[in-house]
Structures are given as C-alpha cells and as structure tokens.
C-alpha cells in the first residue's frame, strides 16, 4: 500500500485550476473554461502527447465547450515513448539509422533501439524503470524519498533541510556540506539501499554526496513546526555546469527537460534552486532560457543559510555530466540520428521563449556565418568566403558575432532559428544548432581534431552535419599555442580554400532544398 502511495505521487496531475469556479450559463454551458488551457504553454504538436499522460485534463476538455484541443480527443494513443502503454508506432519519434555499427550490434532494428535508449525518450524510460523507494512514508502525507539508480534523479516530499550550521568556502560542490540529521524526513529509511548507490558519486554525476546524510527523523518537519520556512511550490534542485559556455550550460537545460518528463510536469509555477555550497555567485550568459522552465528567478542555496527549510515537493534534477548521460558524456552508436527528445526540447524552448520561424522568404536560403572575436579559431579569409557566397543569387548571407554584451541570447536564438545553413568554427557557439529548423544544415568549418562533439550533437538534434574534408585545403596560421600543452589545433587561426568551401556549402544547400520539410518548393536553378 505504501509503495502505491509513493509511486502514485511520482507522476503528479496538473491541477484543474478554476474547475469549480466557472459559473454555469442558463443553458447549462459554462461561461468560462473549466481549465486554464493557456497555462500549459506547450507547442501544438506536443498537446496530444500531454493529454495521453494527463487523462483527467482530457476528460475535462471533452466536457468543456471552450477547450481548444478537442480534435486530439478522438485518438489519445500518441505518446512520448517512455510510457509503459506506449506502442512503438505512436511514439513522438524514432531514430533513423543508415548503417549498422558492428561494434554495437548487427541489425538496423537493434541499432535504432540502442540509439533510442541512449539518447531519446528511451533514456527517460530507463530512468523511470529504475525508480525505487528509499524512504517510505509511515502514513499518508508523511515524507518520502524515491530515486533512480545512483541517485541521479530523486523526488522527495516534505523534506527537511537544516542550514543553520553549514560552512561555506570556495568549493561549489562540497561533499560533506550537510551532516546526518540536517537533511531528511519522517519516513522509514532503507539505509542499506541508500548507501549502496554511491558508485558514481561525483559533483555533476550524482546526488549521492548530498543525500547520503538523509536521516529518518523522529518528527514531522512541517506538522511539528520544525521549519523556519516552508516552501509550498514544487522545487527543482540543480547542480549547474559552466554558465558561460553554451555547450555545457545546455547540458543543464536538456537534463531539466528530461526531468520534467520523468516527473510528468511542465509547469513553470515552480522554483529552481541552484545547489552551490560556495559563497560565490553564478555567471549565466543564457539566463533567458530559464523562462522556459520557471516563472521565477533562480534561487541560490545560500539564500536559505541559517534557516531550517522544508520543501513540500522537491525534485533533484538529472545532472549535466552523468556517465552515459546527456549529452556531455554520451557514447553514441554510429550510423543513427534524429531523436524525438532533442527535437521536442528545441520546440519546447523556442515556443516558451516566443521564438518563431519567419521564413524562408522569396525562396532564399539563409546562410549565417558565426564569426569569432576571440583570440583563436578565427577565419582569416572570412571576407573572401563571404564574397564567394554572395555570388549565389539564392543565398541570403549574414555574418554574426554572438557576443552577449552586444546581442542578447533571445536575439541570437531568433537569428539561429531563422537560418538554413549555419557555418562556424569549432566552439560552443555551434550549440546553437539545437535551435535550427528541422531542414537546416550545420557546417562546422573545421573541427580542430575534435571530430565527435558537434557531429554527435547534430545527430541528436537531427540536423544535417558537414565539416571540412581535405587537409591540404585548410591553412593554419601556425601550429597553435596551448598555454600548457604546447602545439594544439584549437589555439590558432585558419584560412580556407574558397573553391572547396563553396563545394561544401552547395552540398549543404542541396540537402536543405531536398528536405521534406523545406517550406519553399520553387526550383533553385542557380544551384
């Protein structure tokens, strides 16, 4: 019974706010909607999948003349893929594999399944399957703790956190920050199971260091008035990677999005608490992205120092550098691409940040070159390459430098999402490929010997990837000057053969024009 009690809370229902407040009209039809459908803030394509997992809202919609989603009610079979009842043909998407990586498997079908579990909604399915109760409520509404393997994701109710005696220093992820009795709940703790989950104890891979001190308390924190502050809203705890690097920081955001799926809740009426044991602030160049996940400013843990804080509902988010996690530490099977998970993430963020597709206009292929104002990896003959591109009448060419002080992140996203061919040197700025339209191509002009990084990210997102092929057609300024390693290809600048460059860009353009989602069907004879 207690197991059912705990797991029943894992997939919370979206509250039917206003359901009892709508006054009926004389003809029996409610004058106002029975549910605030606008509060879902989901892309239209995601609505049937949301209704599949929230049948109570589907039921209300069926009864509500104001519901805008009635067209989806006749078929609620569409599912993300991690639901136990989900049939493969109704999944949000399924990877495409073009060849078999014999180091992993021997058939295309099994390759698809491997890739789906590695990097698609199958990854969320595996986290859901791992969930087990570590602290069982003694009675209804008592505390609980449920976690996936290695404590990579946890969900707690009525959790107590005592920060009256903590000591902060320069360490952002101090492992002994909280002691026994300073974190816990009123529930029956399976201490043996808890302590067996420490194999991947590491700051950005697990919550084990933070939760190994979880204590079975002899008091009910909230009911017994043991809290200086009670947080009523659901709260996501996160340990964040580098906020000044888009590649690393978006590992935070994609894992928060996966966590929302595991939690079956996409509400923005939640708090995000940055678990940071230092006294430092956090530099975040991409802070606008939080608007896709929360209505409030991110809270630093130190905000609660010297207090006993109780959280009615706490979620410990999946982390950015987990072993076999997404997407920093992911060994991927070759030959496969296009995950529904990363496409859904892109759609979700763009929708909530109000980034729209404005073209292409007049059949032009929009080519964006990402320039660098940093010391290294500059394109030395950039003007020559741009002039060559401008000789193609169907190209609309622009050069951008995504310097945060001059161009805000939302403006950067608008440019990226309205680009058909995105060109740039190896670097974190290429993470923008996550927000290209589905038909787009990304051209990593030179990967500087790091062959997998953005190739794999493009495969995850499902956009076409090309990079420089012929070493005798690229000309480094020198051998590179790494501050400690000496010669290094990432620490110099490059010139490129114009003819080879145009050959590769025209290949990318051909891909864009032939993509089934390319919205402009006119023949581009100039190409």
Swiss-Prot record:
GO terms for molecular function: protein O-acetylglucosaminyltransferase activity. Glycans are attached at residue 354. It is found in: Endoplasmic reticulum lumen. Keywords: Endoplasmic reticulum, Glycoprotein, Glycosyltransferase, Signal, Transferase. A motif (Required for optimal activity) lies at residues 295-297. Its EC number is 2.4.1.255. Residues 1-17 form the signal peptide. Pfam families: Glyco_transf_61. GO terms for biological process: protein O-GlcNAcylation via threonine; protein O-linked glycosylation. One of its GO terms (cellular component) is endoplasmic reticulum lumen. Its main location: endoplasmic reticulum. It comes from the Eukaryota. A motif (Prevents secretion from ER) lies at residues 524-527. Disulfide bonds: none annotated. Catalyzes the transfer of a single N-acetylglucosamine from UDP-GlcNAc to a serine or threonine residue in extracellular proteins resulting in their modification with a beta-linked N-acetylglucosamine (O-GlcNAc). Specifically glycosylates the Thr residue located between the fifth and sixth conserved cysteines of folded EGF-like domains. This is EGF domain-specific O-linked N-acetylglucosamine transferase. It comes from Bos taurus. The gene is EOGT.
